[in-house]
Each structure stands twice: as C-alpha cells, then as structure tokens.
C-alpha cells in the first residue's frame, strides 16, 4: 500500500493505492482494501466519508466487474464519490486481480457538506461530487465509432455536467485521460485543442487495457473549482 499526503487547491489530500490480496475473488479483495484504507485514513483523522475520488482496477474484465460491485456497496449513500474503473494487467505488480486508488480530502471548511449528485436516471456510480467548493466528476465515456468522435462527445458530456454543477470550463483545474493502449495520444491532444480545452492547468494521460464498455476507447475525469 502506498500513501501520499499533499496540498492542492488550498486543501489537504491523502492519496492511497494498493493491490488486493492474491488468491481470493476480486470483490473480497476489494472489500479488504477498503478496510485497510479506512484504517490508514483514521490515522490522519479522516475516514472513507472523506473520499473525493475512487478508481477501481481489475486485471481482467471479470475482476473489474466484481471489484466495481464491491465499491458500489461500500461507497453508498452519502459516501458516494466520483468513480471510474479500468482493466489493466500492467497496473499490477503482484498476482492480485483487483486494486484501488483512493483520493480523500480534508476540507478547508470544517462545516463543509459533501453533496453527491447522481445521474438522471441514476446509475451505479456518481455523476459528480460537490465538496467544499470543489467538484469531482466521474469518468465519462462515449460509444462513438472512432477515437476523435469519442473525445468530442466526452467533452460535450463534461460541458453539460459542468453546467449542471454550476461551474464551467474556465474553472476546470485538471483532466485525467485514460486511453486504450494502442491508440494515439496525439489524436486526443488535437481534439482537446480543437475544442479549446488544451490550456487546462493540468492534463494527465494513462494507458489502460480496457473499460466497463466494450466500445469505449477512453475515459476522462475532470476536477473543477466552483
């Protein structure tokens, strides 16, 4: 398990990542990881209630599905956070089949209230989380037939979500792009530029093997200030 403490946007964050125990089903391994993460967070005066973003990793499709189901059970109700899930064998250093990356935040305002906002109609993951003046958006995807069209559709989806969250692109501070291995990062960069989104303060890229949907070629997460 790796734990990192850092300050960002005038707030304190804790990032925890770990691979699940090998030799057990992915949902069981995921539940065990959440227990370990809770213990780690409590050592700093936080808990899973402070989760802002959660990424689920599966070695294969079945592992991702099981791990995501476990996440949905544990981070439910007001504990819901911005979420995404991916398939990537290269993410793992062990023989485990499930892993988690969790981002928790200590709010600058002790009276700040977490406001999870669901999709309409609801899905098994959150649309976005409003928390102490920040908005954490789940990973958005597209089923368009080619990569450049998927980027364009996702940018449009994020635009709609930003409007719903009463913020806008000028307040987006970070985009995380997770791209299907074998596809061209430059295509994504060009499409973001053509949409006028290439000047965002921080854009990071990660290669993965797959997503929840067979047609998805990328997934984009956004973080914005209010």
Residue ranges with predicted function:
Residues 1-173, 179-226:
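N-terminal presequence-like segments and the immediate start of the first folded domain
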């Amino acid at each position: 398990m790796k734990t990192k403490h850092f300050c960002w946007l005038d707030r304190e964050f804790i990032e925890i990542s770990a691979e699940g125990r090998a030799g057990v089903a992915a949902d069981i391994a995921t539940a065990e990881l959440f227990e370990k993460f809770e213990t780690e967070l409590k050592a700093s005066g936080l808990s899973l209630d402070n989760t802002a973003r959660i990424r689920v990793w599966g070695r294969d499709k079945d592992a991702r599905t099981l791990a995501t189901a476990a996440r949905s059970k544990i981070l439910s109700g007001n504990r819901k956070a911005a979420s995404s899930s991916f398939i990537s064998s290269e993410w793992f250093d062990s023989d485990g089949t499930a892993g988690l990356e969790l981002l928790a935040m200590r709010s600058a305002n002790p009276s700040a209230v977490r406001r999870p906002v669901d999709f309409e109609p609801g899905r098994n993951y959150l649309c976005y989380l409003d928390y102490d003046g920040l908005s954490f958006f789940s990973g958005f995807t597209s089923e368009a037939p080619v990569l450049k069209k998927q980027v364009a559709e996702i940018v449009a989806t994020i635009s709609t979500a930003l409007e719903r969250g009463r913020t806008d692109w000028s307040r987006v501070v970070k985009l995380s792009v997770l791209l299907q291995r074998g596809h061209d990062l430059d295509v994504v960069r060009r499409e973001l530029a053509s949409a006028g989104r290439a000047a965002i303060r921080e854009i990071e890229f990660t290669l993965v093997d797959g997503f929840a949907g067979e047609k998805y070629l990328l997934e984009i997460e956004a973080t914005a200030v209010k």
